[in-house]
Amino acid sequence: LAILFETEQNPIPEGANAEFVLTPDGRKLRTAWWHPAASATRGTILVLHGRAECIEKYFETVSELRRRGYSVVTFDWRGQGGSTRSLRDPRKGHVDDFSEYLVDLETVMREVALPRCHPPYNILAHSTGAAIALLYAARARTQVERMVLTAPLLALSGGRTHFLRVVTGILNYLGLGEMYAGPFRGDLVQLRPFEGNRVTSDKRRYERVRELIEAHPELGLSGPTLAWVHSALRAAEFLALPEFAERVPLPVLIAMAGQESIVSNRAIEEFTLRIKTVGNVRIAGAMHEILQEDDRYREIFWAAFDAFIGEPDEAWRTPFTSPGAPPPQA
């Protein structure tokens, strides 16, 4: 497909559909969806990416979900991947507020998931995407039934969340919100060498992403802006409020990486204890990007995923024609 990209090591899963959809505030989002490999669907999984990621990075995950009988919907958040970039410098990861991401998710639900794929609808989300998923779950009306989150951004590793929120808030107030938050000079984070990385121990999967971005640098991203970091930390502190626990009405499973060095596992554990509908599993040895990890860690994750999402009622096992289309003839 013209708006999806592949490499020899990362082919587009068969049956792909892709299109751009427009948000109410005028942002163009790149979306993709697949129906399952079998002739019936167990429902739909929405895959929500982390910061600086793109649809292509999740092709392997898409294939694994399709083999399990799910339709899959995924998309690039505004400001990254193939969606509308937020600033004149397209390599800066920027939003003014995380509520903009909720607009993206609601748009994709309305324009892609609901009209093209069958219920039940569940979410699989990573890091930044996981934080957005929790914000979405707290809204009064959501069609999502369950969520599986990997390494959610509930706080930064090292306990710097509050301090950095205050500092970035001051700088943002002074009009510096579009500056890089750190020593970035437009270098694409996906092109950094494998050695010393903090996201995966699997060199093959790491190099697969590097190869993709080398071939299609327009999908890559550099560092976040001060405004992005401030908004992310504000969202994390909101999720940590005691009253937020009463606003998550659906079951959530969180997968924590045992060798996590980006987000705070302690914050995840505290979050799990506060909310009775949330459970967690720690995958010893895994690094931050569990879905991009070595198979021995991913197998643990997928076993937990399968047990948690479970087998829907037979009533949901419908042919994967688009909702609203005429039923297939016997």
What are these regions (language model features)?
Residues L1-L22, R27-A37, A330:
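An N-terminal hydrophobic leader/cap segment in hydrolases
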Residues R42, L48-E53:
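Active-site glycine-rich loops that stabilize anionic/oxyanionic intermediates
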Residues I55, V62-R88:
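Conserved alpha/beta-hydrolase
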Residues G93-A113:
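Alpha/beta-hydrolase active-site loop
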Residues T128, I132-G220:
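Alpha/beta-hydrolase-fold enzymes
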Residues V248, I254-M256:
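Short beta-strand/loop motif that positions the catalytic acidic residue
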Residues L250, V263-L273:
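Short alpha-helix in the alpha/beta-hydrolase fold that links the catalytic acid
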Residues A284-A330:
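Catalytic active-site module of serine/aspartate enzymes centered on a nucleophile-bearing elbow/loop
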